[in-house]
Swiss-Prot record:
InterPro entries: Rbsml_bL25/Gln-tRNA_synth_N (IPR020056), Ribosomal_bL25/Gln-tRNA_synth (IPR011035), Ribosomal_bL25_b-dom (IPR020057), Ribosomal_bL25_C (IPR037121), Ribosomal_bL25_long (IPR001021), Ribosomal_L25_dom (IPR029751), Ribosomal_uL5_bac-type (IPR020930)
Listed name of the protein: Large ribosomal subunit protein bL25
Species for this entry: Exiguobacterium sp. (strain ATCC BAA-1283 / AT1b)
SUPFAM superfamilies reported in the protein's UniProt record: Ribosomal protein L25-like (SSF50715)
Classification via NCBIfam families: bL25_bact_ctc, PRK05618.2-4
Subunit architecture: Part of the 50S ribosomal subunit; part of the 5S rRNA/L5/L18/L25 subcomplex. Contacts the 5S rRNA. Binds to the 5S rRNA independently of L5 and L18.
CDD domains: Ribosomal_L25_TL5_CTC
Keyword Ribosomal protein appears in the UniProt entry: yes
Amino acid sequence: MTNKLQVSKRELRPRSLRTKLRKEGKALGVVYGYKVDSTPIVFDEMDLRKILRDHGDNALIELHYDGNKINTLVHGSETDPFTNFYQHVEFMAVKMDEETEVEADIVLVGDAKGVKEGGYLAQSLYKVTVAATPANIPERIELDVSELGIGDSVTVADLPEEKSYKIVSEPDMHIASVNEPVAEVEEEESEEGSTEEEASEGASEETEESTEDKE
């Protein structure tokens, strides 16, 4: 599916005019890359937001301006920390038959057996680097964790891989694991502490008895 975004060329205008454009719901940006000279642009912020919301950050976006159609990926962006409004977006023009490396979201699916047994699922890696042609970049990669028991874990090597893309990240990178319930861990540590304390007390009593015998 082609995601079309209508944009207009813009001049490098005074800050006051850029502020006015933002108040009108316009976002500023720049497009550069394959067969494209760096060109400042302006577009409706909501149009881009809808594309990225529906198709993910790696969506292939076809920019339309001055009769041109340019296939691009979002290469970087700046957002307002309070409103999340896109203040500036970098679009990278891409060659459709050439692979590029991007980060894809890792989404865990399924209810882990270990969680049903009282454990909890902890995820440490949320994105993985993949290489693919622009049209084949995955929106996300799902990993089924339903068979994970307490103490089990998954790494990048466990991610499903399709012919349309290649996973570039190191295969031994840890993604998630099912850990023991915190209460049980604390109880075991408490029991270990009690055992050590009892052993220490026993050794102390034996030392005292030995001293008394000598006297």
